A protein has these predicted regions:
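Short beta-strand elements in bilobed, periplasmic/extracellular small-molecule ligand-binding domains
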Residues: 60, 65-88, 143, 189-202
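Periplasmic-binding protein-like
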Residues: 42-44, 95-108, 126, 170-173, ...
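Flexible loop/hinge segments that line or gate small-molecule binding clefts
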Residues: 113, 117-153
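Short, well-structured alpha-helical segments in soluble
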Residues: 83-102, 113-116
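Hydrophobic core
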Residues: 9, 13-18
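Extracytoplasmic "Venus flytrap"
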Residues: 35-61, 66, 77-86, 177-181
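Bacterial lipoprotein signal-peptidase II cleavage site
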Residues: 18-31
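An alpha-beta-alpha
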Residues: 41, 59, 149-195
Length: 202
């Protein structure tokens, strides 16, 4: 089981790095394992979105490739939370009830919901596409780990100034309901303050 979980974590890391960035579901099973044991993995995507779709497809491809390489069987099932907390909570309850061996949530709301759903049973949660795991309170949890796709805010703003060095005011557009917005917005404000550039928040 430890080797399986290490493999799942590696798959999540690799898939996230390879990606460019209801509960409709499908199931796929890899080649049968020599031991006859089949591991069940739930892939929980927060919503339909091109970059998240890419990550999910990459995770599925890596699961199949690694399972074939290691000679184990993995049955994975896709769940879509439709960006709805109620739907995600229902998925979390179902995944726990169905006895999945691991959960791979994609994006912040999916990850925090799955972390909460597994508090009692400690099913491993390996998240992907989280910009700020600390701000999302996904760190320091024994059964939760994953990958971060944090922005390099200073680099982005440096490029902006190279393209337009005379810029006087910058608009900061973000969602206050999204935990991933907190750190990059704070970093952007600090950067702009240091350059004496005004900003507007929306």
């Amino acid at each position: 089981m430890k080797k399986f979980l290490s493999m799942i974590a590696a798959v999540s890391l690799l898939a996230a790095s390879l990606s460019a960035c209801g509960a409709s579901s499908t199931t796929s099973t890899t080649a049968a394992a020599e031991s006859g044991k089949e591991y069940k993995v739930a892939i929980v995507q927060q919503l339909d979105h091109a970059s998240l779709d890419e990550i999910r497809v990459a995770i599925e491809a890596e699961l199949e490739a690694k399972a074939a390489e290691k000679g184990i069987a993995i049955a994975y099932k896709d769940f879509n939370g439709q960006n709805d907390t109620t739907v995600l909570n229902q998925i979390g309850a179902q995944v726990v009830s169905d006895g999945y061996d691991a959960i791979i949530p994609i994006a912040t709301l999916a990850a925090t919901t799955m972390a909460t759903a597994t508090e009692d049973n400690q099913i491993p949660v390996i998240y992907a596409a989280i910009s700020d795991p600390g701000e999302a309170q996904l760190t320091g949890i024994a059964n939760v780990t994953g990958t971060s796709d944090a922005l390099n805010t200073a680099f982005i703003l440096d490029m902006m100034l190279k393209a337009n060095p005379d810029i006087e005011t910058v608009g900061l557009l973000y969602s206050n309901s999204e935990a991933n917005s907190v750190t990059p917005v704070r970093e952007a404000k600090e950067y702009l303050d240091s350059k004496g550039i005004a900003y507007l928040e929306k």
